[in-house]
């Protein structure tokens, strides 16, 4: 049985029970402390990441906190993988979605954890102002009313960038005016709208901000992964360090293709078990929505079996 670890993105801390799920795990505590130490040493930032997680959702996702929220999620994810590795074999593949690419790459051995933490915070501070442009929302429909070609043509005409996570769940990044049009369209089509983050991730509109940081980011040391990485951006295996770094940046400004990536792993690479690393259950739900015969497991269940 071939297995893939799957790492969710920035929505990992939206719900209180997700935030609290792994906080008592020793490996998670260690990674949070390690991240705090790296930020203090390299950036002079004194942080209390554990304390931050225990505040409310609005505080955690405040735009000036968003880089630390990302650090917390990545620390939790890497800590969970640390624990799983003490009890189970390595997976055959590592798969990240958006921010999940950080923990994916660290866990694959291609990126040092402390370098990842510091680089992300430095990069995020250099794209200050992107929250003034637009936002990122989830758009869900039902099995009975799937998205149509006309819908996708309408999205394109509105200038929004659509990531197809599954056939009935989209991630939409756009300017504020276009997002308002999507919300109005949703009322007519019976779609459900979920706010995700307050800047237009996975869209063309933040390319100038990303390009301004590209040269410095491309100097970050990256290694050949020890566990294969599969990209939800290009839907292929990533091997070369330069390609891994380039995709980190491209994922921010281009659409991602979760269902296509999972389908390719299953059909072409024989993956029959996908393990959601968490801390949230969003990818667990999306995986179960894909009409293929594979096993979906949550890391929480595996951790429970090790106690």
Task: Show where each model-derived region lies.
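Helix-rich "cap/lid" substructures immediately adjacent to catalytic or cofactor-binding pockets
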Residues: 2-95
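Short beta-strand
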Residues: 52, 95-96, 161-166
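Glycine-rich nucleophile elbow surrounding the catalytic serine of serine-hydrolase chemistry
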Residues: 97-106
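Alpha/beta catalytic cores of group-transfer enzymes, especially the acyltransferase/condensing modules
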Residues: 41, 107-246
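Short glycine-rich anion-binding loops that position phosphate/pyrophosphate groups of nucleotides
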Residues: 10-12, 234-235, 280
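Flexible, low-complexity segments
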Residues: 14-16, 73-90, 94, 250-307
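A glycine- and small-aliphatic-rich helix-loop capping segment at beta-alpha/alpha-beta transitions
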Residues: 19-26, 82, 109-119, 289-294
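Conserved small-residue
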Residues: 9, 35, 77, 100, ...
């Amino acid at each position: 049985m071939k297995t893939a670890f799957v790492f969710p993105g920035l929505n990992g801390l939206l719900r209180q029970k997700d935030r609290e799920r792994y906080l008592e795990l020793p490996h998670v505590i260690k990674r949070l402390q390690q991240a705090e130490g790296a930020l203090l040493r390299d950036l002079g930032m004194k942080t209390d990441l554990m304390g931050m997680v225990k505040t409310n959702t609005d505080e955690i996702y405040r735009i000036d906190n968003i880089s630390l929220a990302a650090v917390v999620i990545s620390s939790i994810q890497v800590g969970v993988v640390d624990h799983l590795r003490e009890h189970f074999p390595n997976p055959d593949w590592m798969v990240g979605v958006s921010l999940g690419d950080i923990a994916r790459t660290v866990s694959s051995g291609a990126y040092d954890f402390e370098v990842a933490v510091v680089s992300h915070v430095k990069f995020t501070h250099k794209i200050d102002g992107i929250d003034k442009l637009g936002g990122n929302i989830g758009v869900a429909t039902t099995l009975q009313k799937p998205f149509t070609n006309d819908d996708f043509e309408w999205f394109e005409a509105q200038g929004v960038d659509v990531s197809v996570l599954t056939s009935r769940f989209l991630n939409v990044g756009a300017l504020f005016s276009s997002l308002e049009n999507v919300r109005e369209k949703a009322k007519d089509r019976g779609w459900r709208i979920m706010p995700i983050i307050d800047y237009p991730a996975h869209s063309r509109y933040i390319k100038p901000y990303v390009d301004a940081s590209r040269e410095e980011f491309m100097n970050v040391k990256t290694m050949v992964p020890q566990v294969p990485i599969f990209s939800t951006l290009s839907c292929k295996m990533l091997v070369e360090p330069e390609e891994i770094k380039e995709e980190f940046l491209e994922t921010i400004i281009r659409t991602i293709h979760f269902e296509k990536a999972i389908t390719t792993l299953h059909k072409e690479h024989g993956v029959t078990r996908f393990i959601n690393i968490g801390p949230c259950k969003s990818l667990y739900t999306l995986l179960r929505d894909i009409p293929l015969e594979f096993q979906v497991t949550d890391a929480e269940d595996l951790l429970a079996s090790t106690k």
